Amino acid sequence: MAKMRVYEYAKALNVSSKEILTALKNMDLEVNNHMAMLEEKAIKKLDAKYKKGGARAKSQKPAETNKNKQPQGVNQQSAGNQPNKIRDGKKNDVQNNQFNKNKKNNNNKKNKRNNNNNKNQHQQKPVKPKKELPEKITFSGTLTVGALAEELGKEPSELIKKLMLLGVMATINQELDKDTIELIASEYGVETEEVIVLEETELEKYEEPDNEEDLEIRPPVVTIMGHVDHGKTTLLDSIRKTKVVEGEAGGITQHIGAYQIEENGKKITFLDTPGHAAFTTMRARGAEVTDITILVVAADDGVMPQTVEAINHAKAAEVPIIVAVNKIDKESANPDRVMQELTEYGLVPEAWGGETIFVPLSALTGKGIDELVEMILLVSEVEELKANPNRQAKGTVIEAELDKGRGSVATLLVQTGTLHVGDPIVVGNTFGRVRAMVNDIGRRVKTAGPSTPVEITGLNDVPQAGDQFLVFKDEKTARSVGEARASKQLEEQRSDKAKLSLDDLFEQIKQGDVKDINLIVKADVQGSAEALTAALQKIEVEGVKVKIIHTGVGAITESDIILASASNAIVIGFNVRPDGNAKSTAEAENVDIRLHRIIYKVIDEIEAAMKGMLDPEYEEKVIGQVEVRQTFKVSKIGTIAGGYVTEGTITRDSGLRLIRDGVVIFEGEVDVLKRFKDDVKEVSQGYECGITIKKYNDIREGDILEAFVMQEIERT
């Protein structure tokens, strides 16, 4: 007789597994669960039980019951009533109908009972059909472990085990980021695709499409880039016929300015990006909104690191480059060298058969300026720059700051549409109504068309430089979208800590014990705060990392000092000062405030502080050697070595290494150093001395005692 599992035997008898388990227990046969295997002995006992008496009805299968019962009834009916059926057909028909009806009802009841039994069996049966792996899964944002398991057709427990093997402790409801989803999917050979869903907070959802016939010619937006001190701001001043360069601290443009000029009835908008390497993020932002890049290179300096950086930004933005070779009025100027150097970066002059326009000029004397403006207009005509002025305005934040008198002030570049005073507007995660607009020369305006820079007030908060803005039809929608975007940003900031990321895990493993230098950065404008933060985070000193606790715009306040005190941070003020309350709180809380106006000094000072925080690096220096010639054992003191200084000097505060037959036996410190009976600080070469080693007595004749000191190495 073949072996069977409990549930298989129960299914054969059309009874529940629970009933079979109870019966086995009554027979003193121990079976764990419905999946247990029944031995031949157990099957015989069960057969004996279920083939007798009251259990007989349950022991027969429905098909067998119907098969046996139906022929028996039919045969009896046909054998006993055959003559009556012939004599009284009508009566027999009624009886047969009644019999069939009863039989049908009985069968229905049995079928219903059988269905219920089958249902119970299905509920007890844990084995699910194996789902095939999909070729590809799609997701949006994040997925929980449970949701990913469902997508892959796997049990959540299996995914949790995989994550544990990767060193990640996760629950079924833990959210996984994109990288983790892709990693787990790749383990099963499944492709992934992230679907970008436009939410209610996405500005693109509210943007109106433009028709080709509505587009009109717009002014070009020109970005001036180049190395520090190559004359970018001077060039812009020369074009605008003004002098603002003298007001810049350290001769460096501290934040982006946007200006507009008019030449022969045609307008040109200029963005002045700072040239210092610390403002890389601001320069990149300038390249994103620009149509033409003017690369300023000094004829006497040639190509410098920031020049190459500017070329890369312009190429990444896929915008045409016009090279302005500045300072040609200097005696050391060599424009041909500049042209030669730039060919290495793919900028070949038209005169040499290339496509790049080179304009030699002097920003100081004004020579070549007219030709440069003419070239800008020529390139803009070729580019066919167009926008629809008859729609709701859309554009980018160039700069933003908090003004004491006017509140939140943002410099916007309108890229399409026309901005009006009174327009409901969403700017990044802020919203409001345009209360006032001022153009680049300080005059109030009521409208601003495409490629026009304006300064606006009326926002509920300070936006981030580089944020997108969009005008809405009504203030209610603008408020609701702005509040939703702000809430979403807050949730994302909170969830950044809770969300699972393999990157964080690997970083922690790589970093080990890392010291932090906590900083709070306050600046005059948002762009400077961002650029300074980016520069500080790029400082690399082994063993120490920069942690920016908070960045903000405006004066250093009491709340900044309280935050610094709680997080043990240093406050960096860039072009801002602490107010009275902040000063007194800083003194009381002993918080360090550092105020600067030049980026160089901030970086240098913080770098020096970081180097000071590191555990010092030491180098061992051997200063002397003693040969042990005799030993003396003294109670309460231990072993005293009588020795002769063969090399250098031995001092009382030096380290001591006991060497026997060329092998280091012990390393410790000098306990007592004597010359005759007197304690001495040091003993020089050629003299005898008595010496004991702290917490060590096994000194023998012929041993060598090597004295050494640890010298601190200055970090570079």
From Swiss-Prot:
Annotated tr-type G domain residues: 217-386
Keywords: Cytoplasm, GTP-binding, Initiation factor, Nucleotide-binding, Protein biosynthesis
Organismal lineage: Bacteria, Bacillati, Bacillota, Bacilli, Bacillales
Region (G3): 272-275
Designated gene of the protein: infB
Official protein name in the record: Translation initiation factor IF-2
Organism: Bacillus subtilis (strain 168)
Keyword Nucleotide-binding appears in the UniProt entry: yes
Predominant place of localization: cytoplasm
Pfam families in alphabetical order: EF-G_D2 (PF22042), GTP_EFTU (PF00009), GTP_EFTU_D2 (PF03144), IF-2 (PF11987), IF2_N (PF04760)
Residues where GTP binds: 226-233, 272-276, 326-329
InterPro entries: EF-G-like_DII, EFTu-like_2, IF2_II, IF2_N, P-loop_NTPase, Small_GTP-bd, T_Tr_GTP-bd_dom, TF_IF2_bacterial-like
Ranges of compositional bias, category Basic residues: 101-113
Composition-biased stretches (Polar residues): 62-84
